[in-house]
């Protein structure tokens, strides 16, 4: 299979207590899979873009659960199996004001942290239309910093469009470490996606969102810069023009994975040859739909996205 979009990164087991319960007292935990790069692949796949996910997993029921879940959504896993490695996980306790949502990682020494290019199916990157990874991946280990750079270089040399989400996680590394690592990768990146707050915190840039996008495009020669702005929507700078997209109103059930849904939809439209402004709209609509379902994955359909874009309501569909 030649995938149009290939993503690379870690997928974890997500464990969460029932809504309104605390981890320290819950008698049961909901079991799902989650990872920025696989979330992106799922969103793209469900919108008609052939997608593959590249990684390393333990050869265990937990590792196989990950690949089974991805195949359910049409994503083809290309995995290096490791008999002795462990599966990363995270626990999430959903907050309600004034109590914030709390995330606890248990991902140290996960299989993916030792992944090297010579262990991976690099040829699928060379054959893809686009390759995507995020700042989470190089944060996990020094080995992954090197592997991420080598895969981006492989994609660049093959003429594959490269996309990178800054995706800063303060529980994984400091802003200065993130800046040093990510800026070393930027020369190999065509499409940069970043939350406005991450640009300010990690890259230490100032100004409004259009100014940030223009500065990044100028400083690092990105073909496209996408800035996500939470409730203020998103914008993209491409070809010297800035396009803005407001959010779609949504009744939020679970916000985790919203940004990944946006990116997956955005890339799926770029790969399909759609203009940047159309890709932005698809990203925003898919992100809104993702917020209405539990879990990290955007379990959506193209018809649902089109309905949001047309301004359809949320009544009963009979």
Curated annotation (Swiss-Prot):
This is 2-dehydro-3-deoxygalactonokinase. The keyword GTP-binding does not apply. Homohexamer. It comes from the Archaea. Involved in galactose catabolism. Catalyzes the phosphorylation of 2-keto-3-deoxygalactonate (KDGal) to produce 2-keto-3-deoxy-6-phosphogalactonate (KDPGal). Can also phosphorylate 2-keto-3-deoxygluconate (KDG) to 2-keto-3-deoxy-6-phosphogluconate (KDPG), but the catalytic efficiency for KDGal is 50-fold higher than for KDG. ATP binds at residues 167-169, 228-233, 257-260. InterPro entries: Carb_kinase_PfkB-like, KDG_KDGal_kin_Halo, PfkB_dom, Ribokinase-like. It is an enzyme of class 2 (transferase). It catalyses: 2-dehydro-3-deoxy-D-galactonate + ATP = 2-dehydro-3-deoxy-6-phospho-D-galactonate + ADP + H(+). GO terms for molecular function: 2-dehydro-3-deoxygalactonokinase activity; ATP binding. The active site is at residue 260. Belongs to the carbohydrate kinase PfkB family.
């Amino acid at each position: 299979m030649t995938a149009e979009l290939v993503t690379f990164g870690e997928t974890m087991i997500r464990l969460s207590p029932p809504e309104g319960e605390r981890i320290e007292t819950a008698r049961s935990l909901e079991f799902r899979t989650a990872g920025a790069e696989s979330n992106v692949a799922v969103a793209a796949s469900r919108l008609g873009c052939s997608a593959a996910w590249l990684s390393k997993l333990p050869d265990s029921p937990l590792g196989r659960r990950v690949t089974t879940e991805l195949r359910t959504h049409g994503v083809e896993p290309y995995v290096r199996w490791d008999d002795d490695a462990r599966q990363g996980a995270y626990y999430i306790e959903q907050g309600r004001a004034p109590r914030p949502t709390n995330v606890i990682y248990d991902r140290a020494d996960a299989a993916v942290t030792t992944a090297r290019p010579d262990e991976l199916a690099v040829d699928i990157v060379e054959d893809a239309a686009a390759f995507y990874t995020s700042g989470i991946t190089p944060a996990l280990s020094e080995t992954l910093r090197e592997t991420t750079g080598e895969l981006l270089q492989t994609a660049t040399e093959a003429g594959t469009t490269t996309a990178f989400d800054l995706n800063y996680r303060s529980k994984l590394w400091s802003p200065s470490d993130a800046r040093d690592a990510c800026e070393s990768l930027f020369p190999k990146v065509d499409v940069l996606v970043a939350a406005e707050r991450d640009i300010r915190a990690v890259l230490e840039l100032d100004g409004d969102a259009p100014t940030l996008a223009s500065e990044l495009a100028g400083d690092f020669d990105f073909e496209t810069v996408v800035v996500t702005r939470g409730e203020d929507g998103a914008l993209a700078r491409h070809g010297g023009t800035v396009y803005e997209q407001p959010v779609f109103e949504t009744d939020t059930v679970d916000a985790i994975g919203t940004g990944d849904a946006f990116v997956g939809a955005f890339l799926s439209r770029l790969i399909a040859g759609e203009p940047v402004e159309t890709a932005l709209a698809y990203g925003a609509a898919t992100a809104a739909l993702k917020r209405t379902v539990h879990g990290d994955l955007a379990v959506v359909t193209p018809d649902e996205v089109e309905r949001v874009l047309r301004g359809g309501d949320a009544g009963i569909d009979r």
